[in-house]
Amino acid sequence: MVMPTVVSDRMGTIDFIDYTNNHVFSKCQTDSLNTVNNGSLKHDDYLHGLANGKLVAKQMIGDALRQRVESIDSEFCEPGDEDTFFVADLGEVYRQHLRWKLNLPRVKPFYAVKCHPDERLLQLLAALGTGFDCASKAEIEQVLRMGVDPSRIIYAQPCKTNSYLRYVAQQGVRQMTFDNADELRKIARLYPDAELFLRILTDDSSSLCRFSMKFGASLDSTDGLLGLARQLGLNVVGVSFHVGSGASDPTAFLKAVQDAHVVFQQAAAYGYSLKTLDVGGGFCSDDSFEQMANVLRAALDEYFPAHTGVNLIAEPGRYYASSAFTLACNIIARRTIQDGSAVSVSDSSSMSDDGSVNNGDARYMVYVNDGLYGNFSSIMFDHQHPVAKILRAGGRTMYNSVAAHESSAEDAIEYSIWGPTCDGIDRITESIRFREILDVGDWLYFEDMGAYTKCSATTFNGFSNEHDVIYVCSEPGAMALLGL
């Protein structure tokens, strides 16, 4: 049993659970600090280390969740004690980086800060040597405060605010994107020394979130834009594209790389020697990543082989953040539905002798302390479908057990899960069945909650968008990089 030492800072909304657990890791994991950036990590070693790391991660996350929820009595706790909270495993971010280096060794990741600008996450990625894709002055400021060199930042926002352009010029952040003539003239006026990436239009029809309606120059317009850039004396250094967030069609990368190759040839005709291709984001953290990476890697090897000297970068966001964060929510209210109607306290036919509601064929609406206006906003705009699992019910903690999961048994109880606001659309789950009876004070947890969650939470209805994060680290390499 691995025992944690807890260092907490509730006022700063940060807890860190530090584990002394190097003995449970394989040599692959303890050596990976030295091999992650030199390309010597082998596939079999990675898989062996991954399996070990995942097992330890589950134990650590479970311990952190258990310690927190078992210390809270919803009947007597202070306001805020039972609030939603996250557990973040920085070791998962580290494993994802190993996975990236194994599958796309030539492509340097520039983490999309917008996805989840968590300070600890950014610190680890900076230590791993990644770059950063920033879309605003605030994101650039946050990265620069960590001591990251401006050359490791790309201002990947084709339509920029004038004052932000002046700011990045002062800070020496030179790399940025454009996709239209007006933006070129603005840059020529405010930051003529910038290093520019022409963002091209892609087919993002298979993506969860499409960007082509808003950003990207068509191939019909790229030649003219390159000509204008040359006329204005601007320095175009590369091409960028984005196949959409949460892409599902690997061939989208192939077509985009082919189009980028065409633009490289167009640029050469104007005397530009482009040095970088930015393949954007769209990478998921699930099993589809390897398929996407295989197609992209083959396309890059064909159209931009290593001997050409072209630098390759990407802008992954959810790939790094999604699976690293687990969210715990408290059930704050319950409504019993019998035959399609809410059960009234005065309905004696539905009451037991002790005053409790008979289960029978009842369904329940449970209300939790987070919802679509909070960390579940991704349901609305990111097309996500978070799956609830039982963390604690009936005085028992059930994390990662059979009882925690949805059940298809005939006698399983049906629930819908709702957020805390007064808006009728604030529903997290329309229907899910569990074997357990859930009640006020019980806890649910949701995995894969690191992407576009906390960063887009609002304060609608006066509910807080500041939630505690408990950090664990299931990889010694990550702990070493962070000095923990």
UniProtKB/Swiss-Prot annotation:
The keyword Lyase applies. CDD domains: PLPDE_III_ODC. InterPro entries: Ala_racemase/Decarboxylase_C (IPR009006), De-COase2_C (IPR022643), De-COase2_CS (IPR022657), De-COase2_N (IPR022644), De-COase2_pyr-phos_BS (IPR022653), Orn/DAP/Arg_de-COase (IPR000183), Orn_de-COase (IPR002433), PLP-binding_barrel (IPR029066). Its cofactor is pyridoxal 5'-phosphate. The modification N6-(pyridoxal phosphate)lysine is found at K114. Inhibited by antizyme (AZ) OAZ1 in response to polyamine levels. AZ inhibits the assembly of the functional homodimer by binding to ODC monomers and targeting them for ubiquitin-independent proteolytic destruction by the 26S proteasome. Substrate binds at F381, D382, D423. It is found in: Cytoplasm. The keyword Lyase applies. SUPFAM superfamilies: Alanine racemase C-terminal domain-like, PLP-binding barrel. The active site is at C422. One of its GO terms (molecular function) is ornithine decarboxylase activity. Pathway: Amine and polyamine biosynthesis; putrescine biosynthesis via L-ornithine pathway; putrescine from L-ornithine: step 1/1. Keywords: Cytoplasm, Decarboxylase, Lyase, Polyamine biosynthesis, Pyridoxal phosphate. The record marks H242 as: Stacks against the aromatic ring of pyridoxal phosphate and stabilizes reaction intermediates. Its main location: cytoplasm. Catalyzes the first and rate-limiting step of polyamine biosynthesis that converts ornithine into putrescine, which is the precursor for the polyamines, spermidine and spermine. Polyamines are essential for cell proliferation and are implicated in cellular processes, ranging from DNA replication to apoptosis. Belongs to the Orn/Lys/Arg decarboxylase class-II family. Homodimer. Only the dimer is catalytically active, as the active sites are constructed of residues from both monomers. This is Ornithine decarboxylase. The gene is spe-1.
